């Protein structure tokens, strides 16, 4: 900080004192030094006009200044008739546009009940601070911020820390290594010049939230840009009602927030070269909901050619909250609240356009727990089909992908039922699992089996009575289901055909009062390390007590992330070396982050003791991926396999299925409405909240009949699969034995090919005898797909009352029970030509 001195006195003195002369001299020197160090404001041309930014120094000797261009428009304001429509390119401007202030944020409301379970801890713990970032929202909000490094200081700082007498250090320290400067004087060091001397890689950050809130203004990309020598871009996109409202037809197709992101990427691809960026090395990255957006962008053919790599932090398109399968339901609720619920969807949308943005975003529309009210939808265009189907079809194989999870992502799911001092009681544990099953899976006939199996899998039987152990396993339950399993499945599908894939597990978090002391690395805890916050100290959003270890780990993470943006390999070109920060050797120097593949499933453990490990939580991933979908429909198999098992009588004590919050505590999540499939008979057996339920039963002694039923059910399932496997193997063996007998003679077989007869022969051979009646329940080809059980996973990701998946050419998200909407049209029948921007919704849904 400059020493601020006042001007000298104008009174004349025949004999000025020495102190006055010294003061005057220092004042002039200060002015001269300030004038000499003040760099001119940087300017840059774009296709739409000229921008004036600001050169901002960073408060660290190892970080060079960054040119910031804030509030750059990437699309026309989506206001008036353009609300609920895809974005259009921005208008051009004359003269020089000032880009030195953050733009307005998109309309949102954080004063209602925010879905804390999907938001990072640093967001929910600082809502008062977050509110200062979203003041004065405006629908004219489609802007981005560009952070451009001016010096490549990381390598020179490390060299000067180790060899302060080197010539490049004597020339002016970190400021000596200017862009384009010749570093021939490398003193013979082999790895002296490892920087990008040409166009710089570009990293575009998609902010998270819950699709309802957030802004790119909250994240400063300066440190990441300076340390990693990359251009970092943050952006705003429409959120909530304005970004994701959908009527399920052409009136309002939805996905406007995703289309904003695509338009921003198009702007970056066309203009980043003016900033010194490389349009052929654009990486999109995000955390949480932002990661889900990144995952969805890799599956949309409208993103093709706009970026080459993706970093998916703690999220996936396969998570239950990634896609909204019931948009019409929540659109109807919103229309009811604001007086626009008319039968014709076009009239409904016109009515919603007449409402103010404030009135729309202030409506409290709460989704089912673990789902979203307004988010991306399967529209047959931007998202052509269910994300898992698109992944299986290889839609994202052209991208290099790095993805991972944090150790304790599910903290917020547990905090509401946990006493930080005492852990989780047995009753709380049982209630949490029951509530989880009810809200996520609805009320299937096999709910009891599903619930008890989950409780069985997440009980530490060596320490089952320890409340702290229950707390740990409960966090693991939510972490595994909501983050780990979707991420691992995404990695498996991407790496199946050899596409570059890297997986990590983040095990570190800063010390702060935002979280309980017992918590691990929670959702969003990797964000400050990715953006280098420990290097400059605590901030308003990240009030942590950062140590040298935090600074070192942040440097490591930024090196991995920017290396991946540069080459697609997090190990190169910049090696892990942080001796200029920490005197101790960096353990990451000896760790090589291996590629992920479905067989070995290698991943990097990111923490103070890094190591490459394999098969991250493989047992739990297999449980959620394979067994739970099978148990979800297990009752269907019992109809024809369980003929000797006696069904236990219904429990009349209401103790095993009670959903009342024990000990008088309140539970913030409402039980979903009973679906039509839930019979009156079952409803009569449920607990009535208006009547006195009596005291809860003590946990011990415990009735193990349910666990025994679960064991028998699982055993029956495995026996059934073994029968199928034996039948398939027997058939293949018998077929091979008969192949020589079926081989036609050369004279008879020369006239007609064998291909035409093969399907009929296989079909006849698959018709087994009467002793194999279990195998006749489905088509033959389903019987032999032993490694691919009936895929109920798509159903389980949906809300309890969702409809089955239909073909991409039909509406896939409208419940049959919704009354009052007109007949909808296939997505490939839109009239072309209403949108001249080259954006989606005017194109065919068929990829050429």
From Swiss-Prot:
Q: Which disease is it linked to?
A: Autism, X-linked 1: A complex multifactorial, pervasive developmental disorder characterized by impairments in reciprocal social interaction and communication, restricted and stereotyped patterns of interests and activities, and the presence of developmental abnormalities by 3 years of age. Most individuals with autism also manifest moderate intellectual disability.
- According to the UniProt record, list the residues that bear Phosphoserine: 745
Lipid bilayer topology: Single-pass type I membrane protein
Keywords carried by this UniProt record: Asperger syndrome, Autism, Autism spectrum disorder, Cell adhesion, Cell membrane, Disease variant, Disulfide bond, Glycoprotein, Membrane, Phosphoprotein, Signal, Synapse, Transmembrane, Transmembrane helix
Q: Residues bearing Phosphotyrosine?
A: 792
Carbohydrate attachment residues: 98, 545
Upper lineage: Eukaryota, Metazoa, Chordata, Craniata, Vertebrata
Which residue pairs form cystines in this protein?
106-141, 340-351, 510-544
Family membership, please give it. Belongs to the type-B carboxylesterase/lipase family.
- What InterPro entries does the database record attribute to this sequence? AB_hydrolase_fold (IPR029058), CarbesteraseB (IPR002018), Carboxylesterase_B_CS (IPR019819), Neuroligin/BSAL (IPR051093), Nlgn (IPR000460)
Subunit and interaction comment? Homodimer, and heterodimer with NLGN1 and NLGN2. Interacts with neurexins NRXN1, NRXN2 and NRXN3. Interaction with neurexins is mediated by heparan sulfate glycan modification on neurexin. Interacts (via its C-terminus) with DLG4/PSD-95 (via PDZ domain 3).
The protein depicted here goes by the name Neuroligin-3
Signal sequence extent: 1-37
Which regions are flagged for Acidic residues bias?
182-194
| UniProt keyword Transmembrane, yes or no | yes
Entry comment describing in which tissues the protein is expressed:
Expressed in the blood vessel walls (at protein level). Detected in throughout the brain and in spinal cord. Detected in brain, and at lower levels in pancreas islet beta cells.
Which Gene Ontology CC terms are recorded? asymmetric, glutamatergic, excitatory synapse; cell surface; endocytic vesicle; excitatory synapse; membrane; plasma membrane; postsynaptic membrane; presynapse
Tell me where the transmembrane regions lie: 710-730
Query: Which Gene Ontology BP annotations are present?
Result: adult behavior; axon extension; chemical synaptic transmission; inhibitory postsynaptic potential; learning; modulation of chemical synaptic transmission; neuron cell-cell adhesion; positive regulation of excitatory postsynaptic potential
